[in-house]
Swiss-Prot record:
The lineage of its organism: Eukaryota, Metazoa, Chordata, Craniata, Vertebrata. Its cofactor is heme b. It comes from the Eukaryota. Heme 1 (or BL or b562) is low-potential and absorbs at about 562 nm, and heme 2 (or BH or b566) is high-potential and absorbs at about 566 nm. This is Cytochrome b.
Amino acid sequence: MTNIRKTHPLAKIINNSFIDLPTPSNISAWWNFGSLLGICLILQILTGLFLAMHYTSDTTTAFSSITHICRDVNYGWIIRYMHANGASMFFICLYMHVGRGLYYGSYTFTETWNIGIILLFTIMATAFMGYVLPWGQMSFWGATVITNLLSAIPYIGTDLVQWIWGGFSVDKATLTRFFAFHFILPFVVSALAAVHLLFLHETGSNNPSGIPSNSDKIPFHPYYTIKDILGALLLILTLMLLVLFSPDLLGDPDNYTPANPLSTPPHIKPEWYFLFAYAILRSIPNKLGGVLALALSILILAIIPLLHTSKQRGMMFRPISQCLFWLLVADLLTLTWIGGQPVEHPYITIGQLASILYFTILLVLMPITSIIENNILKW
């Protein structure tokens, strides 16, 4: 009798994706982040579901419903903080995952890469709308500032913003629709993640050497299931340390003040994981220019496969490109720091230089360096 996991229509899909999947024998811990993102997504959907049972999406009661969750609901505080800090862990894993893709040339799987970019945008939209829901000062003003950026679009901008708001300012209609979208988008993300995996399994995984590994594949289970469990335990340990010891470390104190349209906070800033893009937005004095730079800071990932000029896939054997990659990482950390600083000297100049460097590395320096490295190989 054939094994049921290989014949049953549903079990067969799971078997071919997580059990008998032929996997390169040399993939490192950098390949753990895909499964960690899956765990983050499941965790966010579950905690979010329980929060939605007690949350009310009305401007008069939203803030107090969060207070009610934290004070009166059994273990409501831990669910709330797991959800808030779970988002931070989600983005840490996301950026690591994208960084791995850039470093090891995984972007040459263009379908998988492009679905990944769509996933990134969808998750960013979900996180932004989730941040608006507690209806604190930073929620309200963050929503006002970011949605207002769309008014920079010529001709239709103002109408578009008012259409999104459902009125002439961020109000009850905005909060209600943001809650609706915040609830539905994680399921869209789940579907996109399945498509992401579907495309990946068409080609098989990349590996650190960048060399085809068809001659040396091992089954996913038990080797990588054990490895993924280790990664998951470390992820949950980090998350719980954050939740139980300093749950507000990554949040903004202003969000503990109920939203007040008549009082603007001194420094409006998004959550830490959007600060790099926010810094790029602020570094351009023109509104439309800033919005375009903001969009391009992520969209630039879509043209990375076109800019690949190297004869080698990954950066494992390309030391000059490695230096550039780590310069890019340092630059993104600098942008993240600048995004959280007030708009004054010297932060403005540092932000502008870091923004220029970000685009220069990706569009100019990396392709040129790859060509130089190709020529070095000939000597």
